[in-house]
Amino acid sequence: MTRLQKLLCLLAMTTLAQASKGELRCGTSLVGDGAWPLEVEKTCGRPDYVSEYPTATMPGLGVVQTEEHWYYNPGPQQFIKRLVFRNGKLVRVDSLGYGFHVARSPSCSTSTLRHAKTEYELIARCGEPASKRVEWQIPSKQKNREHWETTQPVLVQEWLYEFSSNQFRQVVTLRDGQVTDIESRADR
């Protein structure tokens, strides 16, 4: 191995170690687990897209826990980062696919929908949907060897996109902000 190859290998391992620890490098600084949204914004700048969801409600009190997804799109040469905050605390940094250039005015087609992988990509490429449905689903409990696993509710959304009169409506299903299904629907 040449010296350059060793250096690149070391750099790649360092980057992977940071990603696994839930850290995000912004310039010369790092933000990691437990960071406040204000600290992240001060260090990394404003996110490209933010979505917020209630994750727990109590009768008489209303929403008692929230989750925010912050997306940073550095362009086509780097990966999109999704930061997950629970109750105002950074709990996870996800590395998604390569970034992209965002058009000034979104132009959407069924092909664009089929290539989108996240809620951010849908918004950036197609704009807001005509309508949304949001619900929390609890996966069925399964016995894992000798004990029952605890389950976390999963945020499931359906986004309806309408196109010209000669195209079917498209319903995009997202689970935890990731596109999982797209189906065509005739006008009703």
For the regions a language model picked out, list residue spans one by one.
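Bacterial N-terminal signal peptides that target proteins for export
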Residues: M1-L8
